[in-house]
């Protein structure tokens, strides 16, 4: 859930109010100063993204993060050079679970929804993908369980789990079915 929805949901504060703007700005500062420097990539993320590309996927990232944070996160994950395009909350009027960011990423991929698969780690990702008409594979790396990710075509413990069982994954099945055009993360 993006900040535009989180503050009203949790604290009853509109993100576009004076107070909401100050809170959002400070949240970003705290994240960049205290948390971002300590983040590291999950195991096998780069290998998994390379596998997607080898198989012909166009990798597009759809994130509720601000564009400046997203570029830093992709560098930390070690995949910034492998990503064809991004769509962030900076470029959408509504964040997840609304489908705006996912639809923007899908448009950038050039793929129709039925030929794309999204990879997500929150219930908001699942809802956004389904509302955009895209199949989604869930990963439990976001702190959510398989039960929380209900609606995903399959759920894995993380990128390493997908990579380790790639041949049986929804990504490989799409390739075998001859329906491959793009993938959104």
Model-derived features: positions:
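Conserved phosphate-coupling serine/threonine residues in phosphotransfer and NTP-handling enzymes
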Residues: 63-65
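N-terminal helical cap/lid subdomain that shapes the substrate entry/recognition surface
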Residues: 1-46, 50-57
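Asp-based, Mg2+/Mn2+-dependent phosphohydrolase catalytic module
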Residues: 50-51, 67, 71-185
